[in-house]
UniProtKB/Swiss-Prot annotation:
All copies of domain Carrier, residue ranges: 2-77
Post-translational events: 4'-phosphopantetheine is transferred from CoA to a specific serine of apo-ACP by AcpS. This modification is essential for activity because fatty acids are bound in thioester linkage to the sulfhydryl of the prosthetic group.
Chain positions found as O-(pantetheine 4'-phosphoryl)serine: 37
Organism superkingdom: Bacteria
InterPro entries assigned to the protein according to its UniProt record, in alphabetical order: ACP (IPR003231), ACP-like_sf (IPR036736), PP-bd_ACP (IPR009081), Ppantetheine_attach_site (IPR006162)
Subcellular location, principal: cytoplasm
Molecular function, one GO term: acyl binding
Name listed for the protein in its UniProt record: Acyl carrier protein
BP terms from Gene Ontology: lipid A biosynthetic process
C-alpha cells in the first residue's frame, strides 16, 4: 500500500500536471509547482476525496507545501 506521502504526491502530480519525480516535500505549490488559486481549490478537493476528510478554508490556506499537506493528512485524515 502506498504511503500518505506517495498518495499526496500522486494527487499533486495529477492536479498540477507536473512530473511526480519533480515533486519534493519542500516544494511550494505556488512557487515551485506553478499552481494558481483555482489549482489550489481543486487540489484541496482532491485531497479531501482521497483521504475522506474535510479541510476547512482557513486550514487550506496554511497548506502551501507538499510536506504541510502530508502533515495535515497525517493528523486529520483517514488512513
Amino acid at each position: 500500500m502506498e504511503s500518505i506521502e506517495q498518495r499526496v504526491k500522486k494527487i499533486v502530480a495529477e492536479q498540477l500536471g507536473v512530473n511526480e519525480a519533480e515533486i519534493k516535500n519542500e516544494s511550494s505549490f505556488l512557487d515551485d509547482l506553478g499552481a494558481d488559486s483555482l489549482d489550489m481549490v481543486e487540489l484541496v478537493m482532491a485531497l479531501e476525496d482521497e483521504f475522506e476528510t474535510e479541510i476547512p478554508d482557513e486550514e487550506a490556506e496554511k497548506i502551501t507545501t507538499v510536506q504541510q499537506a502530508v502533515d495535515y493528512i497525517n493528523s486529520h485524515g483517514k488512513q
